[in-house]
């Protein structure tokens, strides 16, 4: 057994000696580069980028629009002349009667003379004139601060509490990823929509969700294509699955928007579409296998090893089941796999896991580069590649020493598996500095992740799902970051039990409901300050939602996708960008509408806006352009695809702002 362990470790060291140190430690460097200070810098960059549509909106403001805004205040809160529907005049008036008006709206309207919907906000300590003289900078800083606060409360408290709930309920990881974890990642958008319906009395929630959808699809994919270390090849199934559901949901939303009102049954249909997606994810593996069996009728190539190795492997492992049926590869219903996911890296990590139910065996065969996004056929090809490399290295181990080692599994897999034609794919492994470390349970990852002792220790600390710590950092940069986020983290640390601590795990209901309360507070402050910024600059809340709020609430999506893209997981990055929007469209929008109709005795919700309907149509068109662009790039995420995505995103921003300001007329409006 010692001979086998030494031979295995020597093989890995010899293989990694041909790679550059940076290549062997690429996973460590990836995670270190994405610190919170860089996240703050990224948020500031997004704010700077969003000033482009703001400038367009400011230049298009005219006195006629101000007069039109005053007229709209007389006729109704978001009902502009020329946009009231031909048969809905009386209906809109009735709905307006049920909408509570803020007490200070008349004073604000007389002072500002704008067409902003006056929500139930407290009176600002700064007057409009003071804000225009520079006090608005404080509101901008506060709004950005709320973006960071929402990301922290979701990542550190809300999602871990959802993880405990899924463990208690015994929900499979696919369903949990499409439900609880999707809710955790989209909580800011959901609460923004709730605030827009019940407090702001505007379409800020719709604008935020639509803008966030476009941001996730175009900007996030563009960033992944530009910042990935290499050209990434995409597979069709995850993209086809999520885009198909998303297209159906968007078509339903466009149809429901045609009359500018949302009935209770329309909201219910959108929620039903979401539950259909959850049911599909429950049977995703079976459906994927069936579809690929129907499509792929290729020849298979039987991968074998030498007769002596095959006999030795058979003798050592005759009692084991075949590789596809190994229980340890199955993620369905595994609470341990759910708990050990990289949730500290992002709040959408478990939703990304819904790409493939067998996606958690990343470390079980060395650092397999594309393992997380592979189907069974892809995994078999990956293991065959390992076998090929081991055969080339002439790693011969005595059959008497081959007991429960990693070589058993590789040889056995090669003997049992029949594969379609494929090319060899890359295997990334980290060399071991301690040749005597044992190989545990047939898992190479235990003996290959200690290449550099200090670096491995630091990375292990980052990887572990450790509870939140308020200990003082060591270097200056981390200390500055700590002081910036301390006003957010300290109240959360005091009021919410950290369920990642074994002693606090039983208090998960307190963490769950407490996190919801904090998310509601942060979302309210974010929308309020965004309203003040828009009122000062002279733009509507809809435009704020399409630009600043959409980008701010999508920061976790962006960080997650860039991380996985830099690890070589292109399918995760693209599919998570599309899949995260399904929850927003089918829950984030219809749930507040349905609650509103129930509270107001099934009265419909008005969603009239100058450009939001056309923005939804533009979102649908942009989705088609994304598919065509990926196809034109031959299903590869390269720099050209990144620049195409950026161009489409800025085109969407400019056109949406011009439509909302009525500089352009929406050609599809009725």
Curated annotation (Swiss-Prot):
Extent of Basic and acidic residues compositional bias: 106-122
Modified residues (Phosphoserine): 337, 341
GO BP: any one term: calcium ion import across plasma membrane
Keyword check for Transmembrane helix: yes
Sugar-modified residues: 112
Keywords: Antiport, Calcium, Calcium transport, Cell membrane, Glycoprotein, Ion transport, Membrane, Phosphoprotein, Potassium, Potassium transport, Repeat, Sodium, Sodium transport, Symport, Transmembrane, Transmembrane helix, Transport
Cytoplasmic topological domain residue ranges: 1-38, 155-179, 227-244, 288-506, 564-578, 633-639
Bilayer-spanning residue ranges: 39-59, 134-154, 180-200, 206-226, 245-265, 267-287, 507-527, 543-563, 579-599, 612-632, 640-660
Cell compartments where the protein resides: Cell membrane
InterPro entries in UniProt: K/Na/Ca-exchanger (IPR004481), NaCa_Exmemb (IPR004837), NCX_ion-bd_dom_sf (IPR044880)
Extracellular side: 60-133, 201-205, 266, 528-542, 600-611, 661-670
Tissue: Expressed abundantly in all regions of the brain and weakly in the eye, large intestine and adrenal tissue.
Alpha- repeats: 175-215, 550-581
Source organism superkingdom: Eukaryota
Catalytic activity: Ca(2+)(out) + K(+)(out) + 4 Na(+)(in) = Ca(2+)(in) + K(+)(in) + 4 Na(+)(out)
Region (Disordered): 67-86, 91-122, 312-335, 394-414, 450-471
GO cellular component, one term: presynapse
Chief place of localization: membrane
Keyword Lipoprotein: no
GO molecular function term, any single one: calcium, potassium:sodium antiporter activity
Topological category with respect to the lipid bilayer: Multi-pass membrane protein
Family in the record: Belongs to the Ca(2+):cation antiporter (CaCA) (TC 2.A.19) family. SLC24A subfamily.
Function comment: Calcium, potassium:sodium antiporter that transports 1 Ca(2+) and 1 K(+) in exchange for 4 Na(+). Required for learming and memory by regulating neuronal Ca(2+), which is essential for the development of synaptic plasticity.
Protein name: Sodium/potassium/calcium exchanger 2
